[in-house]
Design a protein with these regions (language model features):
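Cationic, histidine-enriched alpha-helical/coil surfaces that engage anionic ligands
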Residues: 1-324
Length: 324
């Protein structure tokens, strides 16, 4: 999907200038994980004003920071502290859901507009662009209003305070004092194994909505493995962890395309029904629905090849350095 990049967003500070985000070589697991959490918490705080101002891509970036934090707390709960991790995972899930409603409306509208671009004028029957705009504009407005309400809520204020408390350290989980080079690769390996199991399950799921749902679970697991590897890259072996994270990002990306097409297909169907009930010709929406179906099928096939490359043993050898 091509996204307008004519606007720019002030980026958060680079990790090197945020206090406590450069763990020493040979550091404990707690130090490495807290460093990663501080980077993401800083990003979350930095982006809030941009989200409130409706700056381009700010919701997406804040959502990514929220997901990274949530993935880290889920993956490294035995390092931070299980009780803190469980509570913050739930609260970050709430924030991510609010951000997601606003972001998904943006992405889906842009996806459908782009999908319509190559359609010959003679096949654009009726007020198609206006109907697409009318379908998504109120949804985006409602989602944005709900997001701003969430950012103004005491719940969000408490979440930021809890993040400040936990990231201030020290990490108090049972594995916090163990060497990062032993503990973190094992945690990434566990996240990867979950993605592997889900991919195997998706392959054996009959085509249709059930497989679409299964592939969406694979995508979430690949994203979690990617973010876990990013956190592990702050300790040894950093280069190998970053390489693995890039492979998981490829899996996440192709499955994201597939999922977007599934949602776009559903939206095209809803648009067609609305057009029909309004007495309009629904031909173009049927064309759009089939186009999205074909695209989803292609990206699903692509995902199998991308997964095979990403899951090669050479991308995972560094995980076997972990003790246990």
């Amino acid at each position: 999907m091509t996204v307008n990049t004519t606007h720019t967003l002030t980026r958060p500070e680079r990790p090197a200038v945020i206090a406590g985000t450069k763990p020493r070589p040979g550091c404990a697991a707690g130090d490495a994980v807290l460093a990663y959490l501080r980077i993401q918490a800083h990003t979350l705080n930095t982006l809030e004003s941009a989200v409130r101002a409706d700056r381009f891509d700010s919701v997406h970036q804040m959502r990514v920071a929220t997901r990274r934090l949530r993935a880290a707390f889920r993956t490294f709960g035995q390092i931070v502290l299980p009780a803190d991790s469980e509570h913050l995972t739930a609260e970050l899930h709430w924030l991510g859901r609010e951000l997601g409603q606003a972001r998904d409306a943006e992405v889906l509208a842009a996806h459908l507009r782009e999908s319509l671009q190559p359609t010959p004028p003679e096949l654009l029957i009726g007020p198609v662009q206006a109907r697409v705009q009318g379908y998504f504009a109120p949804r985006r407005a409602a989602a944005r209003a709900a997001l701003l309400e969430a950012l103004d809520s005491p719940r969000y204020t408490r979440l930021l305070a809890e993040l400040d408390r936990v990231t201030a350290g020290p990490a108090r989980g049972p594995l916090a004092g163990a060497p990062a080079r032993d503990v973190l690769p094992a945690a990434v390996r566990h996240a990867f194994q979950q993605a592997k199991r889900r991919m195997r399950r998706a392959r054996h799921t009959p085509a249709g909505p059930a497989r679409d749902a299964a592939l969406h679970q694979v995508r979430k697991s690949a994203r979690r493995a990617r973010y876990a590897a990013e956190a592990a890259s702050l300790a040894e072996p950093g280069k190998q962890a970053r390489r693995f994270a890039r492979q998981m990002k490829k899996v996440q990306s192709v499955l994201g395309d597939q999922h977007d097409a599934v949602l776009a297909r559903q939206a095209a169907r809803d648009l067609g029904i609305g057009a029909h009930l309004a007495g309009e010709n629904a031909f173009t929406y049927g064309l759009l629905q089939e186009r999205e179906h074909q695209y989803a099928e292609r990206r699903q096939a692509d995902a199998r090849h991308v997964w095979r490359r990403a899951a090669r043993p050479r991308h995972r050898r560094w995980m076997n350095t972990a003790a246990g």
